[in-house]
Amino acid sequence: MQKISVASAALLLALSFQATAAEPKEEMTTSGIGITMLKEGSGASPKASDTVKVHYRGTLTDGKEFDSSYRRNEPATFPLNRVIPCWTEGVQKIKVGGKAKLVCPSNLAYGSRGVPGIPPNSTLIFEVELLDIAK
């Protein structure tokens, strides 16, 4: 009976270490963007001058969704240097095929002006899946 208990304890310990190691960690950029890699890509990373094709979901910190290409069932394509600074910097950290969570401080998003559906001075949270880079 004791052998089963020791084996069970060892298995639970191994599983808890594996679960802890598998949790993605948020990294902060020097500008203040929080980036968590949810899925590692295997392709190239874009440059600010590239046009990217992405699927994304944007929410406020309370979880309210303000935009989603998934909901529209159509990826978005845009020049990376023509979006909010958080995206220009953050999406460059993702490889094609990868997915990341970007936590964008308001000064790197829409700041004090806000936009319809996004109040002024809002921190924004995006899940961004990089599908392709058009050079």
Labelled PLM ranges:
Residues Q2-K135:
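Cross-family detector of peptidyl-prolyl cis-trans isomerase
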